[in-house]
Amino acid sequence: SSLYGGTLSYKTFDILAQYYDCDKDEQTWQKLSTFDQTAKKGQVSGLWSKVYTLLVNVNTIIEACDERKEVLNSEYYHVIKGEALALRGLLHFEVFRVFGPIYSVDPETECMPYSESSDLKVRPLLKASDVARLMIDDFKAAEELLKEYDPVIKKGALWGDEGPGLPNDMVYRSLRLNYYAVKAYIARLALYTGDKAKAYAA
């Protein structure tokens, strides 16, 4: 909730953009709105560390899907790994939007590492164009995994439980990073990098 319940939705960057009138009663936000370096550094570095911590967890799921594939049925394997790959692309995209360059101006600027493993090794900064390519690779891999197995494609948004004692893992798919959300992120990333044809095709 600290990311999507605030920092990446309505809070930190909207305050920095002066969308809100923060008075003295809201001391933390007022400091942020006046570009107080301590307040800004805490919010922004918190975003960076939180996202990369989440990426370790996501990569652990991706690795476990392949290492323990025999314990998952085919539907679970494809949906869980597909969602995790999409989430990896999404988390990198959020950091990319905040810390990356203006893509249309300088796509060759080194801006951030791309985390594809659960180990804690320090990775080199990559060019924005390389980060964009890796994100699209993750989204495309997720799309391939989900397209035959995500229940949302054939059954739509299932809002009811399966029934007493039955698992609900494959219902409420409209609240998850499902097949259509992945396609939307492919289009969004393509627009962000200026590839309108790829965005339209998505």
Residue ranges and their predicted role:
Residues S1-D14:
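Acidic, glycine-rich segments characteristic of secretory precursors and extracytoplasmic regions
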Residues Q27-F99, K121-D130, E144-L146:
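Conserved, well-structured interaction surfaces
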Residues E67-Y76, L145-R173:
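Flexible helix-coil transition and linker loops at the boundaries of alpha-helical arrays
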Residues L90-S118, D137:
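Extended ligand-binding groove/face enriched in aromatic
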